[in-house]
Every structure is written in C-alpha cells, then in structure tokens.
C-alpha cells in the first residue's frame, strides 16, 4: 500500500487538496492517505454499464473533479456525453482508463475534452498495481500499429518496478527459468514495491504465481506480451485465452484490435470453436446499436474478414458470429468472458 501511495504521488503527481470521482469504491481507500477528497457519483458499482452519462459528467463538473479511475465503459459514456453536449472538462488533470484494453479511438476522444490533463492507461492487477502506464499521446503514436495487431501499448514500467518476460507455461516456474529473447512473446512477470509477496494463507496459489529470480520475488500476471523496438511493453491478451489454431498460436489482442477498428463494431472477441486443440478461430462481433440491420451486419462481417486476411495472412479466419451484447465481468463491465462464449458457440 505504501508503494502504491508513493507511485501515485511521484509518478502521477497526485496532491493534497485534489478531488477524485470514484467509480470503484476500493480505489477510494487511497484518497485519505493522499489528502484527496472522494466524490461518489450516482452509480451502482456492480453495474457500471448502467450508469447515467449525464450524472457522471455533472459530477465531474459540479465538484470540479481533478482525477478519476474508470473502466472503458464509463469512459465511453463520458466521452459521448461531452461530444453530444459540446462540453469540456477544464479542471481534469488525469483520467485513468483501466479494467480492460481501451480502444485507441476512445482514449484520444476522451483526451480531446481535457484542456489541461492527460488520459492515462495504467497496467496492473489486484496483486500488482500499478506496473506500467502510457499516456494518450503514446497511444496516439502507436495507434496504427495497435490496429494492425501489434498489441495494446502498456508503456514503460514505473521506477523501481521490474518487468520480465518468460516462456509461456501452465506449470510453476523453477530455478532453471530463463527470459525470452528480445522481441519474443512471453508471460509478463513483475517485481517491485507495488507487487504483493504472497497470497494470505494460500500457499498453493503463492507457489503457482510467485517465484524467485535474481533474488527478487516475481508475480506471474497471466498475461502475454513483448517489448517492442523502443522497449515499450505491449499487451497481447490473457494466457488462458490464447488459441492453438492449425496455423499456430494466436493471441486475442493481435486479432480483436483489427476487428474493433472496423466502422460499426463496438467490440469483439476472438474465440476457438471446438473442444480439442487445434481449434478453429472465430470472431464474435458486437455491432454498434445503429449498425444492427442485416445489411449493415453483412457489410461489417465482410470488412472484418477482409482486414484479417490482409493483416493476419498466416492465419485462416473465416468464421464470424454476431452477439447483441458480449458477456463481461461484474467489476468493470469490460473484461469479456471469451471462454464462456467459446463454450456457447462450440456446443451449437
């Protein structure tokens, strides 16, 4: 906790006297230690997707909020409301977007309403937060690559945080473990002052997720990624959601960012059809509300398959499905339940 407080002060410049709009109550715990006022919007934290966009923006403006942490679904509501009403967020210093990968277009759109602030995309987990971060300007610089399937931008590790990549494995790491070579995909593992040492009274979970390397205790994030040519950490998806296809392994972020860049797509999910490896890759598409006619859906599906064939030529992706709403986690209403979708469509 002390490491997290230091990171919020030293890295993000959070200061006493600021005002935070808290959309996830647990993050309000930081505010008393920072000397920051907490404002709670009219929101049910268990269903942020149902929050009123008007209420959220009015809270930001009425209480002169300087900082907030929200999931992409909240960020989208705020950005759309500001756009529709031609509103600005003049005193906002920082808008943290986290909980699931945020489309570059959303990040840039939010930033356009903040005259004196930044949109930050922090990376971390309950066991390690924050690990790294990037700003909206970095996302803009890498947007073209992201939408080509090069992975989400996670930025640079925070001072004092060590990020290593190790070969993908479902087994606990032993003493002989070695890092992957530069540019190779591996499991993201982290150590530092913002990383927990163990699970309380859960030795089995600690054994599976923690290991010693170069005299430091590292935590396995369960995420896949790589360092690009600029040593920027890139995110490719969850390890358990990587597909073993006839053409090789395919990570979710290499595919979904391409699909999400198609006009009319709200979000998407890469799943595998079948119960045994190798599985057939299939893209589940959730269209925007105004693109749900049979004609519009057909255009979207054809464009999705066309882009995938160009940008992922090594993979054969010919299957698409349409869902009116993708199943998501209850906490952020943003993490897509891909394994549940795979089970549903594999049984049909």
Language-model-derived ranges and their functions:
Residues 175-176, 222-224, 261-288, 316-319:
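C-terminal boundary motif of the adenylate-forming
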Residues 172, 178-246:
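Conserved ATP-binding/catalytic segment of the ANL
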Residues 2-19, 24-66, 81:
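Conserved AMP-binding/adenylation subdomain of ANL enzymes
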Residues 269-274, 282-283, 305-348:
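Conserved C-terminal "lid"/linker of ANL adenylate-forming enzymes
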Residues 195, 209-210, 232-260, 284-295, ...:
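Adenylate-forming
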Residues 9, 20-21, 36, 67-69, ...:
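Gly/Ser/Thr-rich phosphate-binding loop
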Residues 110, 225, 258-260, 308-309:
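Hydrophobic C-terminal alpha-helix "anchor/cap" residues
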Residues 150-157, 179, 215-216:
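Short Gly/Pro-enriched turn/cap motifs at secondary-structure boundaries
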């Amino acid at each position: 906790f002390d490491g997290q407080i230091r990171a919020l002060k030293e890295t993000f410049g959070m200061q006493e006297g600021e005002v935070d709009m808290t959309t996830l109550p647990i993050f309000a715990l930081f505010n008393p230690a920072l000397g920051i006022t907490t404002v709670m919007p009219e929101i049910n934290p268990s269903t942020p997707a149902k929050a009123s966009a008007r209420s959220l923006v009015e809270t930001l403006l009425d209480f002169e909020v300087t900082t907030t942490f929200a999931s992409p679904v909240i960020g989208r509501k705020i950005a759309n409301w500001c756009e529709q009403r031609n509103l600005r967020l003049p005193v906002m210093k920082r808008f943290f977007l986290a909980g699931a990968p945020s489309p570059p277009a959303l990040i840039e759109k939010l930033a356009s309403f903040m005259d004196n602030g930044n949109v930050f995309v922090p990376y971390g987990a309950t066991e390690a937060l924050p690990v790294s971060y990037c700003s909206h300007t970095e996302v803009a610089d890498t947007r073209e690559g992201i939408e080509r399937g090069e992975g989400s931008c996670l930025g640079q590790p925070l001072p004092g945080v060590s990020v290593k990549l190790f070969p993908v494995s479902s087994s606990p790491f032993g003493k002989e473990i070695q890092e992957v070579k530069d540019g190779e995909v591996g499991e993201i593992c982290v150590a530092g002052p913002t990383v927990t040492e163990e699970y309380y009274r859960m030795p089995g979970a600690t054994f599976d997720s923690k290991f010693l390397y170069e005299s430091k205790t590292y935590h396995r994030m369960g995420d896949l990624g790589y360092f690009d040519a600029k040593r920027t950490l890139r995110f490719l998806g969850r390890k358990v959601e990587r597909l073993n296809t006839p053409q090789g392994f395919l990570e979710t972020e290499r595919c979904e960012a391409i699909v999400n860049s198609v006009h009319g797509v709200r979000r998407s999910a890469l799943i595998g059809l079948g119960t045994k490896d190798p599985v057939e890759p299939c893209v589940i598409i959730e269209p925007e509300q105004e693109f749900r006619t049979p004609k519009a859906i057909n255009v979207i599906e054809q464009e999705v398959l066309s882009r995938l064939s160009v940008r992922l030529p090594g993979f054969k992706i010919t299957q698409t499905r349409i869902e009116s709403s993708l199943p998501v986690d209850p906490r952020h209403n943003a993490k897509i339940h891909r394994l549940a979708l795979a089970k549903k469509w594999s049984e049909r």
